Each structure stands twice: as structure tokens, then as C-alpha cells.
Swiss-Prot record:
Protein name, as recorded: DNA-directed RNA polymerase subunit beta
SUPFAM superfamilies assigned to the protein according to its UniProt record, in alphabetical order: beta and beta-prime subunits of DNA dependent RNA-polymerase
Reaction equations catalysed: RNA(n) + a ribonucleoside 5'-triphosphate = RNA(n+1) + diphosphate
Source taxonomy: Bacteria, Pseudomonadati, Spirochaetota, Spirochaetia, Spirochaetales
Record Pfam families: RNA_pol_Rpb2_1, RNA_pol_Rpb2_2, RNA_pol_Rpb2_3, RNA_pol_Rpb2_45, RNA_pol_Rpb2_6, RNA_pol_Rpb2_7
GO molecular function: DNA binding; DNA-directed RNA polymerase activity; ribonucleoside binding
Keyword terms: DNA-directed RNA polymerase, Nucleotidyltransferase, Transcription, Transferase
Organism: Borrelia turicatae (strain 91E135)
This protein's record includes keyword ATP-binding: no
UniProt family annotation: Belongs to the RNA polymerase beta chain family.
Length: 1155
């Protein structure tokens, strides 16, 4: 165990401990499967799988005679064929059988038939938050998407209100500010006037519409009020004579008033535009946009003044023709259809989130209605018109109140919902088509749609990803990732700058630093350290409550919506022993503004300075002294650090290292307190303190050199001794890239910031040979090679050491079965598994046919189809596995067995490997220098690494200098430090430590040249820096081709290492050779070394025979060009110097030869 010294400016202990870092995965899946609640038979009815089955059942047959009812579901743990480890080894999925109990009820007779019906298998989550699918660990990444609900926004001159449901048709309102009309769009189809839409939904008269949206005032009609009334709008129809009606919404003229007076109208109802705010709880409007829509209606239907209302038929016709153009219309059907689009639970679902958002926006208390109501539509229109008039403000689409997170559970629920709707359709068909009394529950349910949907989701969904397993931090970050892409999300090409940008609501919820560089920047982000997802899917972050200027220890989690307009102080605001603020003015933030406030006005206080960043950013010491771009690179590169054989924990840490190791799931923790009985490299046994009997022991299997998804090595090493007492939760074995239970991604090295003979030009790194000799950066990489033994039409393939036409020397690494021996060192081209395949009759010569007929099967020829070590790979065989049908029961069709060989290679640090610090300071090893040639300190200590000082000023990552200084002090004082982010050690503190260690307080020292022994002219900054070796190793990239595959059409060599391809000689390379007049070099590069087929063969012949050569024919690409032109209709022929035609195809050659 390491004892760390806390060097932060704040207190060592936090107010609130970090939550379990992978709880977003674990909680979401538990909510989906509800295994704990199932045991007590009390699952929540509106969550996860339970809600899926409750939505679909009961099902009734069309004739009403039979009903299929659902009782409960359960997961059969006994059906688990393999453990997690076996699944990985045998390429199987870790899943259990799902069954549901159904009752088939005959309504006429009352008979009930009960059956537990198989519903396919369901992948189970491991305690590390991953799934094992076909032997590989996968992670379901959480998706961040637009929240259902209502949103108001503006684009160009158009104001929009959009009601987004969880499932169903989108409803969009838009105001065209140039024309002052309000339109409705359903599912982005053509526009409909809003008044027509309202009439179709039941507000069928002008009076009803006006009464809904406007405050109405009564006014007497007399000579005194004439002037006041003129130009105002009627709110209620006035009928004077039989054929004389003044309609609500019409403008009143002087002539109209005269008519009123003559006909004895004493009082009229007018629209009160000014009183829109005078009635509490009512959202009245002051805009005349709706009245303009009445005018537009009149023009549309050619109505004259004095005519009555629009008929129901004409309204429905107008609306329905836009919804379903070209469909025959009956008025009742049209009305039904329109109502079911928004008001029926089958077709429309706001989801509890959508309803919550609508109620929050309009101040309603309803949290249960899942469909739209007329009130929602009226409120939305009123709010949009109030925004248009400037009485309300637009929404911010990128506000985290308008974006929510869908985690594993919800994604899976949606998959099951889609599949179950297909199951329901099939079941209903079967109910009506089969003989009723012969029905059985299991015959009605078809499992295929469910099985295929779940399989497809886990295998191919954009959100189901191959786990990044390079190191524990990479695993952890992958599980905490938020992705805006994927089904129902954004697309990379259409996402603009605003969506990707940092928003003030991200504070404490999403990390502003950690995101990929490149096209996905800002679309893939990381969860902040303390963030949680609430029941509605909104991100929440914790705050300490402040009451009357006094800070309490009460913690409240707030979502972005709740946090709006609250006044929040920073975590490092100075507080005295009585929890009162020391300063009179405190630095705070309110929404997006940063200001100062008196303590009395403060509502909340941050929990910790690191709450606004993600886990990997919180591992960077002195983060606040780095430029954010470099911090981003530092966060991303820590995830690429390869686990080393002998890692060390960083001398300068941030206090997060232990937490990351503990929550990542790679270390082994004690389940119960007890005494260690056995501790070997493969197994630990602990006798718990509260054991039930002597056989009640806790056993732990340790992983030894297992392969990860990224071909790194997964290995456990024991941290305890036999007889030792351990506590519950204590770390008893280290995993990859952990040391003493802490994350240890690299090593501490003695660094000098000094240029050295140009070897560290442009970020290159100069390294001492000591590092290589002592294996400080040696890592183990394990590759898996597999081969299938198939049943062919000509007979089975065989695994054997008896391979035709192969020398005994090559076969001496195989055992008698034809499988390579464990422990053998293999090189490229070596045979790992000898396999022969029967040859087809077509390949056999007449002589062989004769022998076969004489000697029978024995003489049948076979083809060598052995598994060989590919180019660029060598290493030691550490394991061989044979998987047969007896082992797993379901190999792919036609496959008898699968053989896997694991080859491990120890990779030392070498020139070309990429290294990096934690501050985005990356570089490639340019030279490994003998220890005696490295620059050394006055006491003779040689440096381990030389970095270029020019890599610091322009990159603005000063954190690396501060880390080096403090690391130097720590090394000589034998101390390890915790330097939490945003409250790191001050310069004074670092200088004090340096003095204590006996160094100059700038940590600059005189260095001596290893070649000459002379001191360098100036003092050099020296320190201890933590460096990582990244997963960009030169061994994986180094590639050379002699002869290899060619592309079929162009006959040019393929490209890339995977295809064993060649180097591309492009347009610009040709210019370079032309500039030097290197005609012959250029000719051979463009012909015989590329795609001159006949020339290639000829030159090979000449080289073998030793004849001086200068052959070149016509490159194949020229022929391709010619054929391309012929395809366009040009008849082209080519001729040589002597006027003879050169054939381009074999057909042409024949023709020319004939003539």
C-alpha cells in the first residue's frame, strides 16, 4: 500500500464520496431486468421488461372468444451453460433463458390454460458493466438525444414550436414573421392553417377559438364609446337581422357601430389585447396572428362577410387532404383518424419524460397522461405567440434540460417493444385463423422476432461497441461515454457547431475536456465524475445546500432544469469552522453568468472542484495550468497507455488513481472480511470471519496472461500473504496497469528539458538504454490465431502432422497431432496447425485416378490448408484450445471443430514507439542512447529521458513542468503526493519541498555532456516526469513488401499492411522524380514495379538468369483507361513506332494475328 501526502489547497477528505463509477451501466440494466424485485415478486410495472409485457398483454382475439393474459416473467439462471470465463474461451455468449407465464382464457367457457413460454435468451451484464457476446466483451454506450416534450426555437424569420413525442407523430407550429400567419405541420408534411387545425380538433367556431386564446372585455355601445370601439375586434357573434351576422374576429367600423345603435345593441364583447396577463393561470395572448388566420381562411374558402361559419365537412376535407393526400375521404373516418394520431395511446406516447417536460413548461400538475390533450395544444400555441410578441423567451436547444440520456436498459426496452409488437401481430393472426379450442399459449407466441432483434442489437447496433480494453482507464471511460450518434440521434455530417460546443449546463454533468479529436468532436463526450442520471434520463450533479449564507452538509442532486436561475458558489470558496463564508462577496454562477454575490443570496455550493470534469481529466495533476486542447490530448492518451510488466504508480498523483483501479473491475476485491488461507499465483482462498461452517470459504480465481480485445495482456498478481487478515472491499490482487491497488499506467523517469544533437527535434524523444535494459517499458502482447476444421463435400478436413510437400524441418515444431507445442518460439511462415483438405476430382491427374481405383481411398490427394504465422508476427505459443461440438453444442454449420492458438510477444521499448506524458506532451522515440552517453547530473546520475524545451511554450502545458519539479522532490524524499485538480499545490509549496530535498528551488541543475564530460553552457530544468508507452507500437506499423497480391482490375499492388500491400507512388512523388530527370527510375516504378504484367514476369526471369535488364511494356492502367474510353463510345487503337497495332485484349491479339 502506498501512503500519499495530500498537497492540495483544500481539505484531504471530500464532503461527498464519488459514486461507483460504472453505476450508470449497472443501475440501468437492473432497472430493466429487475432481478432483485423479481425474487420478491414485486417488479415495478412501468419499468423495463415488465412494462414491455404489460403493454402488449392481454391480447384478445378479433371475435372476442379468447384472451391471452400475462402473469409474470423470470430469468432462468440454472440455464447458464458456461461461466463468464468459459464463454470468453469458447466464443459463446453469456446469456440466460427468458420465460413468461401466460394464461390462455376461453371467455365463453371460463377455461384457463397456463404455460411458461420460452422467449429466447437474454444477455446478462457482468458485474463490470459489460456483456459477453460471441466470446468478446462488449459495452452498450449510453446515448444522449433530444428529449421528448415541447421546444420553442427560431430559424431565420420563422418561429417554431415543436411537440416531440417518445413515439408517434411530430406536431410543429410555425409563425411566418413576414406574413403574420400561424401554421401547423404534422410529421413535416404540408402546412395547415392553425385555425383549420383547431376547428378539426373540436374548437369549431370562431367564438370558441377566440374565447380560448384571448381575454374578453364587455363594453357599452353609445355615442361616447364610438371612438374607443372603432377598429377593435368582436369576440362574440352579433346577429342583427336574419341575414346580417357580425362574426367574432371581425374588425368593427364606424358603419357597424351605427348599425348596432339602430338595432338596439346595448353591449358588445371585444377582444382585450392589453389584458393578456391579468388573469392568473391563463395564458392569454396579445397578438392578432390568429385573427389574420381567420382572414386567410375566408380567402381560402372564398367566404364573404356576413356568411356563417365554415362547415365541418370543408374543414375536415382541407385538413385530411394534407394528412393523407389522394385518399378517399369520409368525414367520420377523417375525424377519427385525426384524433387517433394524437389522442390514442396505441398511436401516440409522450412518455413520462415528455409529459414531465410539458407540465414543467406550462406549470401543470399532470404527470400521468401519456397522450396529448387539447390543453397542451392550446398552451403550446399561446406560448409561441407570446414569444413572438416578446413576452416570453425562446428555448435553447442545446440546454441539457432539452437533452436526455438513454442507457442500456432503456435501449433494450425499446428493442423488446419493437419485437413484441411483431409478436402481438402474429399472435392475433393465429388466434383468428386456428381452431379456438385446440389453442395452446405456446403455439400463439412466435419467438423469432425477439431472438433476431436482440441478436441484431448486440451484434450490429452502433451503440453496442467492442470494449476498449487497452487498460483499466480505457474500460472505465468506455462505460461512462455518452454518444450523440446512433439510431434516433444526430448524424456526424449534419451536426453543426452549436451541438458540439461546451454549454454552461454541462457543468458537473458532462466533461468539457474529454472528447475525441476529429469528426466526432463534441458528439462523443464523457460523464463528469459526480454526475448521475435521474429517473427521467436527465443528468444531475450534486450540490451542498446553503441556507441563509450558512453552508450545510445536506446534498441535493439538481438537473439542468432545476438548476436554472439558482445561485451557486464554487467548491473552494473559503468557509470558517461554523460553516459561514469568510469573504463578503463570493464568486458565483447563475445560469451562464459568472458574478459575485453576498453569502445570503447563495442557494447552493459545489461539492468538489473536480465535479465538472471526467475521470480521465481528473487524473491529470496540475490540470488548471494546462491549455484545454492539451488537456484533451492528455485525457485521450492515458486511455491508450499499454499495461507494462513493471509499472509504478505516479509520484505525483491526483487521488483518483485508487478509485479508478477499484471501480474499473480489473483488480480483485475481498467480498468479506477474513483470513487468507491460500495465496498462489492462480488462486486465493479466504476464510471469512463470519463463516457458516468450515467449508464456507471465499475463493478467487486469478487471470494469468489472458488476451484482451486489443491484444494486450490481462494478468493478476497477488498482493497478500497467507495468514494475513483482510477487510471487506480491500484489494487483494492487482490487475493489468495497476500497482498496490492504484492505477499505474507508466513509470517515473528522470527528465531533462534539453535539446540533444537534434535527436529530439519536433517532439521526438531521446531515451536512455537503462530503461530498455531494466524492462521499464516492456509490455506483453498476445495474439489469437484460429482455424476451422470443416466438413467438405469431398470428405472432412483433418488436423495432422502429415502434410504433403512440406519439409521435416518445418514440421518439427508440431506434435504428433499436427498442433504446435506450447512454449515453442514461432516466426512468420511457421505452421501453427497442420490441416489438410481433400482435393476435388478436377485437380487430380489421370495417373492418380488409376492409383485411386487400384488402392481405394488411401491414395486420394489432399491440399495443404495449414494455419501459418502471418507476416510481422513472432512470439511464444502460450496456449492452444480445441473447441468441438461436444464442448459448446452449437458450432457454425459445417464446422467440426475450431482450434485457437495464442502467441505472446514481449515488446521492449524501441525507436519508433510513441510515448506521452499526462499533459498532452507526446512524441516518438528517436534514439535509445547508451547510459554512458546520456547527459548526467553533478553527482553522476544520468538522465532517463531528454525532452525538447520548445515543446512547452507554444503548447502552454505548464503542468508538466510543475509535475517534474514536485516529482523530483518526491523521489528524493521518498514521498508520493496527491495533488487534486483545481486545487493543486502552490509554487511556494513545491519550492519548499525542493529545498527540503536539497535542490535548487527552480529545480534547474548543471548538466554534463555524456560524450565529453563538459558541462552544458546553461542550467537545465530537471525533474521526475510520469511517462506512458502508447498503443501505437512500431512493430504493428512496420511493413515491407517483396512480392504480394495485386488488384484484379488495375493489376497494381494492393495498399496497406493488412493486405501485405506496397507503398503508393502518387502524383506528387512522380513530380519529384521528374524534377530530377530520373527517367529510368520513374519508368521502372510506373511499369515493372507496378502494373506492367508481361514486364513483371520478364524482369523476374532476367534477374534469376542474371541478365542485365531494361524491360518495360504497357502498364495495365493504360489498358483500363483505353477500355474506359471505349465504354464512352470512342473507338481507339494504339500503334508502335513502326505503325504496327498493339493489341489491348486477347481477342484483339487473335484478330491481328489472323490479318
Amino acid at each position: 500500500m502506498i501512503k500519499r501526502v495530500h498537497l492540495g489547497q483544500g481539505k484531504a477528505e471530500e464532503i461527498l464520496d464519488l459514486p461507483n463509477l460504472i453505476e450508470i451501466q449497472l443501475n440501468s440494466y437492473e432497472k430493466f431486468l429487475q432481478l432483485d424485485r423479481l425474487k420478491n415478486n414485486k417488479p415495478l410495472l412501468n419499468e423495463g421488461l415488465e412494462s414491455v409485457f404489460r403493454d402488449v398483454f392481454p391480447m384478445k382475439s378479433s371475435n372476442g372468444e379468447v384472451a391471452l393474459e400475462y402473469e409474470k416473467y423470470y430469468v432462468e439462471y440454472d440455464s447458464l451453460s458456461f461461466t463468464e470465463k468459459e464463454c470468453k474461451r469458447k466464443g459463446q455468449s453469456y446469456e440466460a433463458v427468458l420465460k413468461i407465464r401466460l394464461n390462455l382464457q376461453f371467455l365463453t367457457t371460463g377455461e384457463i390454460r397456463q404455460k411458461d413460454v420460452y422467449m429466447g435468451t437474454i444477455p446478462l451484464m457482468t458485474d463490470r458493466g459489460t456483456f459477453i457476446v460471441n466470446g468478446a466483451e462488449r459495452v452498450i454506450v449510453s446515448q444522449i438525444h433530444r428529449s421528448p416534450g415541447v421546444v420553442f426555437y427560431k430559424e431565420k424569420d420563422l418561429y417554431y414550436a415543436r411537440i416531440i413525442p417518445y413515439r408517434g407523430s411530430w406536431l410543429e407550429f410555425e409563425i411566418d414573421s413576414k406574413k403574420d400567419y400561424l401554421y401547423v405541420k404534422i410529421d413535416r408534411k404540408k402546412r395547415i392553417l392553425v385555425t383549420l387545425f383547431l376547428r378539426a380538433l373540436g374548437l369549431d367556431t370562431r367564438e370558441k377559438i377566440i374565447e380560448t386564446f384571448y381575454k374578453i372585455k364587455k363594453i357599452e355601445v353609445n355615442e361616447d364609446t364610438k371612438r374607443e370601439i372603432t377598429g377593435q375586434y368582436l369576440a362574440v357573434n352579433i346577429t342583427i337581422k336574419e341575414n346580417m351576422t357580425y362574426r367574432a374576429g371581425d374588425k368593427i367600423t364606424l358603419q357597424d357601430i351605427e348599425d348596432f345603435l339602430q338595432n338596439g345593441v346595448k353591449e358588445i364583447d371585444l377582444i382585450d389585447f392589453d389584458g393578456y396577463d391579468s388573469v392568473p393561470g391563463k395564458h392569454f395572448i396579445s397578438s392578432d396572428v390568429i385573427l389574420n388566420c381567420f382572414e386567410k381562411e375566408d380567402a381560402y374558402f372564398s367566404l364573404k362577410d356576413g356568411f356563417k361559419e365554415l362547415s365541418r365537412e370543408s374543414v375536415m376535407l382541407a385538413v385530411y387532404s394534407v394528412l393523407l393526400p389522394g385518399e378517399p375521404i369520409s368525414i367520420d373516418n377523417a375525424e377519427n383518424d385525426l384524433r387517433t394520431v394524437f389522442f390514442s395511446e396505441k398511436r401516440y406516447d409522450l412518455g413520462h419524460v415528455g409529459r414531465y417536460k410539458l407540465s414543467k413548461k406550462f406549470g401543470l400538475n399532470d404527470l400521468t397522461t401519456s397522450v396529448l390533450t387539447m390543453t397542451d395544444i392550446v398552451n403550446t400555441i399561446s406560448h409561441l405567440l407570446r414569444i413572438y410578441d416578446g413576452h416570453d423567451v425562446l428555448d435553447d436547444i442545446d440546454h441539457l434540460g432539452n437533452r436526455r440520456v438513454r442507457s442500456v436498459g432503456e435501449l433494450l426496452t425499446n428493442i423488446y417493444k419493437g419485437a413484441m409488437s411483431r409478436v402481438e401481430k402474429i399472435a392475433k393472426d393465429r388466434m383468428s385463423n386456428k381452431e379456438v379450442f385446440n389453442l395452446k399459449p405456446q403455439e400463439l407466441i412466435s419467438v423469432k422476432p425477439i431472438v433476431s432483434a436482440v441478436k441484431e442489437f448486440f451484434a450490429t447496433s452502433q451503440l453496442s461497441q467492442f470494449m476498449d480494453q487497452v487498460n483499466p482507464l480505457a474500460e472505465l471511460t468506455h462505460k461512462r461515454r455518452l454518444n450523440a450518434l446512433g439510431p434516433g440521434g444526430l448524424s456526424r455530417d449534419r451536426a453543426g457547431f452549436e451541438v458540439r460546443d461546451v454549454h454552461y449546463t454541462h457543468y458537473g454533468r458532462m466533461c468539457p475536456i474529454e472528447t475525441p479529436e476529429g469528426p466526432n468532436i463534441g458528439l462523443i463526450v464523457s460523464l463528469a465524475t459526480y454526475a448521475k442520471v435521474n429517473d427521467y434520463g436527465f443528468l444531475e450533479t450534486p450540490y451542498r445546500k446553503v441556507i441563509n449564507g450558512k453552508v450545510t452538509d445536506e446534498i441535493e442532486y439538481l438537473s439542468a432544469i432545476d438548476e436554472e436561475k439558482k445561485c451557486i458558489a464554487q467548491a473552494n470558496a473559503a468557509v470558517n469552522a461554523e460553516s459561514n463564508y469568510i469573504d463578503d462577496l463570493i464568486s458565483v454562477r447563475v445560469s451562464g453568468d459568472y458574478t459575485t454575490m453576498i453569502p445570503k443570496n447563495i442557494d447552493y455550493m459545489d461539492v468538489s472542484p473536480r465535479q465538472l470534469i471526467s475521470v480521465s481529466s481528473a487524473l491529470i495533476p496540475f490540470l488548471e495550468h494546462n491549455d484545454a486542447n492539451r488537456a484533451l490530448m492528455g485525457s485521450n492518451m492515458q486511455r491508450q497507455a499499454v499495461p507494462l510488466l513493471f509499472p509504478q504508480p505516479p509520484i505525483v498523483g491526483t487521488g483518483m488513481e485508487r478509485i479508478v483501479a477499484k471501480d474499473s473491475g480489473v483488480v480483485i476485491k475481498a467480498k468479506r472480511s477474513g483470513t487468507v488461507v491460500l495465496a498462489t499465483s492462480k488462486r486465493i482462498v479466504i476464510r471469512p470471519d463470519n463463516a457458516d461452517d468450515e467449508h464456507d470459504l471465499d475463493e478467487y480465481e486469478l487471470a494469468k496472461y489472458e488476451r484482451t480485445n486489443q491484444d494486450t495482456s490481462f494478468n493478476h498478481s497477488v498482493l497478500i500473504k497467507e495468514g494475513q487478515v483482510v477487510n471487506k472491499g480491500e484489494i487483494i490482487a492487482d490487475g493489468p496497469a495497476t500497482r498496490y491497488g492504484e492505477l499505474a499506467l507508466g513509470n517515473n523517469l528522470l527528465v531533462g528539458f534539453i535539446p540533444w544533437n537534434g535527436f529530439n527535434y519536433e517532439d521526438a524523444i531521446l531515451i536512455s538504454e537503462r530503461i530498455v535494459k531494466e524492462d521499464l517499458y516492456t509490455s506483453i502482447h498476445i495474439k489469437e490465431f484460429s482455424i476451422e476444421v470443416r466438413e467438405t463435400k469431398l470428405g472432412p478436413e483433418k488436423v495432422t502432422a502429415d502434410i504433403p510437400n512440406v519439409s521435416g524441418k518445418i514440421l518439427n515444431k508440431l506434435d504428433e497431432n499436427g498442433i504446435v507445442r506450447i512454449g515453442t518460439y514461432v516466426k512468420p511462415g511457421d505452421i501453427l496447425i497442420g490441416k489438410v483438405t481433400p482435393k476435388s476430382e478436377g485437380d487430380i491427374t489421370p495417373e492418380f485416378k488409376l492409383l485411386t481405383s487400384i488402392f481405394g481411398e488411401k491414395a486420394k490427394d489432399v491440399k495443404n490448408n495449414s494455419l501459418k504465422v502471418p507476416h510481422g508476427t513472432e512470439g511464444t505459443v502460450i496456449d492452444v484450445q480445441r473447441i468441438t461440438k461436444n464442448d459448446v453444442g452449437n458450432l457454425p454449420p459445417g464446422v467440426d471443430e475450431i482450434l485457437k492458438v495464442y502467441v505472446a510477444k514481449k515488446r521492449r521499448l524501441k525507436e519508433g514507439d510513441k510515448m506521452a506524458g499526462r499533459h498532452g506532451n507526446k512524441g516518438v522515440v528517436a534514439k535509445i542512447l547508451p547510459v554512458e552517453d546520456m547527459p548526467y547530473l553533478a553527482d553522476g546520475t544520468p538522465l532517463d529521458i531528454c525532452l525538447n524545451p520548445l515543446g512547452v511554450p507554444s503548447r502552454m502545458n505548464i503542468g508538466q513542468l510543475m509535475e517534474s519539479q514536485l516529482g523530483l522532490a518526491g523521489k528524493y524524499l521518498s514521498e508520493y503526493y496527491d495533488v487534486p485538480v483545481f486545487e493543486s499545490a502552490t509554487n511556494e509549496c513545491i519550492q519548499e519541498k525542493l529545498k527540503k530535498a536539497g535542490f535548487n528551488e527552480t529545480s534547474k541543475a548543471i548538466l554534463y555532456d555524456g560524450y565529453t564530460g563538459e558541462p552544458f553552457e546553461n542550467e537545465v530544468m530537471v525533474g521526475i516526469i510520469y511517462m506512458l508507452k502508447l498503443h501505437h507500437l512500431v512493430d504493428d506499423k512496420m511493413h515491407a513488401r517483396s512480392t504480394g497480391p495485386y488488384s484484379l482490375v488495375s493489376q497494381q499492388p494492393l495498399g496497406g499492411k493488412a493486405q501485405f500491400g506496397g507503398q503508393r507512388l502518387g502524383e506528387m512523388e512522380v513530380w519529384a522524380l521528374e524534377a530530377y530527370g530520373a527517367a529510368y527510375t520513374l519508368q521502372e516504378l510506373l511499369t515493372v514495379k507496378s502494373d506492367d504484367m508481361s514486364g513483371r514476369v520478364k524482369i523476374y526471369e532476367n534477374i534469376v538468369k542474371g541478365i542485365p535488364t531494361n524491360v518495360s511494356g504497357i502498364p495495365e492502367s493504360f489498358n483500363v483507361l483505353m477500355q474506359e474510353l471505349r465504354g464512352l463510345g470512342f473507338d481507339l487503337s494504339i500503334y508502335d513506332d513502326n505503325g504496327n497495332q498493339i493489341p489491348l485484349t486477347e481477342k484483339e491479339e487473335e484478330l491481328i494475328n489472323k490479318t
